[in-house]
Swiss-Prot record:
GO terms for molecular function: methionyl-tRNA formyltransferase activity. Its EC number is 2.1.2.9. Pfam families: Formyl_trans_C, Formyl_trans_N. This is Methionyl-tRNA formyltransferase. (6S)-5,6,7,8-tetrahydrofolate binds at residues 110-113. It is an enzyme of class 2 (transferase).
């Protein structure tokens, strides 16, 4: 039986681990990030992958730094024939990459060489792409730069969010892995080098990227809102207060107006001007310190005026 070590951390990784177990591989260990304090009460919480591994009685390693000798030697002691990673969250050292008979492979949520990095799902939507996908490739020490083994495309729908695409890609990754591993073991795959001239990056989202830039086009603002839903959530400011914007709709604007100003107030939301003739009607938001709500609920208690400017005094 093929002995596999799985390395992964978030919800995205769980279907991949589950599929390895279902397909009959001997998962001799799981490597995941350390437990983290979560929520206002800072409750120490295990990763989704750790929770899944413990359901199946699989030993779990949680190195703070996998590159340290005493940590990676614990992985090597498991003597895996194959290592599979999916959103593990640390750069894996060569000592591990070179050890397994069948190598180390990674399930990455983009069509490499596009969108290398930790936030490919967010960026696919924020950049307005109509398709993305899964790549399974050999791992190297350089970020997401290994030779490609298999790929599958996944369509991005007009109203797709990072949350819905995350779920689709997670399942697509598990399915593609199920088809890829037997071919890899049988030596039937021809690795393809990535074209370095076509590389783009999707680095982890920073706080300053979450703010809506109303001077962009309506399409770009709409994609920004979708791409940060349900986490970390786009925001703007209204009357000096931070407001998270959970959802909006593209609407035509007939009269020119300064980007970021409210140009219409309707029953289900208010329309904000952008840099072109497409405005964005905010329909779901979350004022600072309050719960997420529909804009119609918000408008029952707060009455912004037409001409009010959003995005100031953040």
């Amino acid at each position: 039986m093929i002995k596999v070590v799985f390395m992964g951390t978030p919800d995205f990784s769980v279907p991949v681990l589950r599929r390895l177990i279902e397909d009959g591989y001997e998962v001799v260990g799981v490597v995941t990030q350390p437990d983290r304090p979560v929520g206002r009460k800072k409750v120490l919480t295990p990763t989704p992958v750790k929770v899944e591994a413990e359901k199946h009685g699989i030993p779990v390693l949680q190195p703070l730094k996998i590159r340290e000798k005493d940590e990676y030697e614990k992985v090597l002691a498991l003597e895996p024939d194959l290592i599979v990673t999916a959103a593990f969250g640390q750069i894996v050292p060569n000592e591990i990459l070179e050890a397994p008979k069948y190598g180390c492979i990674n399930v990455h949520a983009s069509l490499l060489p596009e969108l290398r990095g930790g936030a490919p799902i967010h960026y696919a939507i924020m950049e307005g792409k109509e398709k993305t996908g899964i790549t399974i490739m050999y791992m190297v020490e350089k970020l997401d730069a290994g030779d490609i083994l298999t790929q599958v495309e996944v369509e991005i729908e007009e109203r797709e969010t990072t949350g819905s695409l995350f779920d689709k890609l997670s399942e697509a990754g598990a399915h593609l892995l199920s088809k890829t591993v037997p071919l890899l073991i049988q030596g039937k795959l021809e690795p393809i080098k990535q074209n370095e001239e076509e590389v783009t990056f999707a680095y982890n989202i920073k706080r300053e990227q979450e703010k809506i830039d109303w001077t962009k086009t309506g399409e770009e603002v709409y994609n920004h809102i979708r791409g940060l839903n349900p986490w970390p959530v786009a925001y703007t400011t209204l009357a000096g207060q931070v407001v998270k914007v959970w959802w909006g709709e593209k609407v035509p604007i007939t009269e020119p107006a300064e980007a970021g100003t409210i140009v219409a107030i309707e029953e289900d939301g208010f329309v904000v001007a952008t840099s072109n003739e497409t405005g964005v009607k905010i329909t779901e938001l979350q004022p600072s310190g309050k719960k997420r709500m529909s804009c119609s609920q918000f408008l029952r208690g707060t009455k912004p005026e037409i001409g009010t400017k959003l995005g100031e005094n953040a």
